[in-house]
Amino acid sequence: MTIMRKNHPLLKIINHSFIDLPTPSNISSWWNFGSLLGICLMIQILTGLFLAMHYTSDTATAFSSVTHICRDVNYGWLIRYLHANGASMFFICLFIHVGRGIYYGSYMLSETWNIGIILFLTTMATAFVGYVLPWGQMSFWGATVITNLLSAIPYIGTSLVEWIWGGFSVDKATLTRFFAFHFILPFIITAFVLVHLLFLHETGSNNPSGLNSNSDKIPFHPYYTIKDLLGVILLLMVLMILVLFFPDVLGDPDNYTPANPLNTPAH
């Protein structure tokens, strides 16, 4: 098995990335969040795929299709809330991951950092278009307000907003294209994640001391696979507590009111 792991064209890539990878011996729990982000991304793609099987991206039926998922689809409520709260966990991990990078000077690894910035912005875009899909009041007015920010661009602003909307307001065309973007962007994110890892493994990871750790490396497996597994268990525990006990605590009650272009949410 060891010979195959080290020589097989596909397995040796995995081997050099997750098994025999030389890793600094002193990286702390702040370094766990990269793997947690990978887990979050997998959860989001899987739950999102199953949601897409039942969702309809039409203004007349989008809201009721989400209700249908929660009420009529087997474990649809679980899939929907895993996806919604999984997105929140994704961003919590993302902020900590970036914060650790700033605190410990990981921005010195410029290629890895720049791909990370692209990942951050792409994830924000994905979350934004995804929030519009349930077509509640906050979905509709959130989309209206955020896209309207582009109208501040001199000369081309108004035309740009109408181009993104596909009309003169957030409507059917907007919802359809946002669903298309929301479906494709996670796969683009996955591709960028591989590039992010590629650049990271070119230089090796940073470590809390900030010193060169080439003289003190240990194999990634079993040491950091076990450490990451603990992080994953804790992440899933927090996620499941949210999903099973407090599924709506991070959401807005106004999004349970269908989108109405004639009324802004009560505030």
UniProtKB/Swiss-Prot annotation:
Compartments it resides in: Mitochondrion inner membrane
UniProt keyword list: Electron transport, Heme, Iron, Membrane, Metal-binding, Mitochondrion, Mitochondrion inner membrane, Respiratory chain, Transmembrane, Transmembrane helix, Transport, Ubiquinone
Binding site for a ubiquinone: 201
One of the Pfam families matching this protein, by short name: Cytochrome_B
Record GO terms (molecular function): metal ion binding; ubiquinol-cytochrome-c reductase activity
Residues where heme b b566 binds: 97, 196
Membrane-traversing stretches: 33-53, 77-98, 113-133, 178-198, 226-246
Residues that hold heme b b562 according to the record: 83, 182
Membrane-protein topology: Multi-pass membrane protein
Function: Component of the ubiquinol-cytochrome c reductase complex (complex III or cytochrome b-c1 complex) that is part of the mitochondrial respiratory chain. The b-c1 complex mediates electron transfer from ubiquinol to cytochrome c. Contributes to the generation of a proton gradient across the mitochondrial membrane that is then used for ATP synthesis.
Name this protein carries in UniProt: Cytochrome b
Species the sequence originates in: Abrothrix olivaceus
